Amino acid sequence: MKSERVNYPVKLLNFILSIMNSYLFVLIVSIGFAESSSPKSSTSCSLMTSCAVEKCLDRGMVGRIITESSRDEVFGNLVEKFDMVCIAAKCGNECSQCKHCHYALEQMSALAQGEKTSGLCPKLETCVFNCLTEDVSKVLSCVATRCNVHCYDGDCPSCKMISRRIFSNICKQHSMTTQPQIKYEGTCPNLFMELADDYVAMKKKKL
């Protein structure tokens, strides 16, 4: 990743942060996972996950995505609704107690200001940084088409773990495994892993 700082005007920084709220979830929840194995951290992150699903994902919208999306589309349609800005605003206490959520906000700020991040998820971080430096006005579509996949392709296991927790919570609430277009006999976490692999394969075909 480039180490030099890129200076953006303040208004542009605010614009960057506002439009990156959903797609950068896959990056910013991923940092600090190495410290998240303690019981206290795990419990705190579970509270953050529950809060995120309750306050930052409209239940009706999620239900429509699950019932109206094809099996091939449901995963992407869901994970692209994960909103870190909302989590920071509405689940601030829970986020501050979850190390990789709290630290993630600092990483998002660093990215938006063109500063070097921790480098724990090299492909994902480099991809987002490149989207910012290439054309900030198109950063949303750039991150969606080029970077989102790195949360699930093995580059960033911590990102995949957090996404799996949120997905599994939603899956259980909405009985996803029994949906006619899904028809999955296993558990929600296993469904996540299968759909994530399919998502990566589909994304790579489009690149």
Swiss-Prot record:
Sequence intervals crossing the membrane: 13-33
Protein location: Membrane
InterPro entries recorded: DUF5332
Keywords: Membrane, Transmembrane, Transmembrane helix
GO BP terms: defense response to Gram-negative bacterium
Predominant location: membrane
One Pfam family linked to the record: DUF5332
CC annotations in GO: membrane
Topology in the lipid bilayer: Single-pass membrane protein
Domain of life: Eukaryota
Role: Acts downstream of daf-16/foxo to suppress tumors induced by disruption of gld-1. Potentially a direct target of daf-15/foxo.
PANTHER family (UniProt xref): PROTEIN DCT-5, PROTEIN DCT-5-RELATED
Protein name, UniProt field: Protein dct-5
Species name: Caenorhabditis elegans
UniProt lineage: Eukaryota, Metazoa, Ecdysozoa, Nematoda, Chromadorea
Gene: dct-5
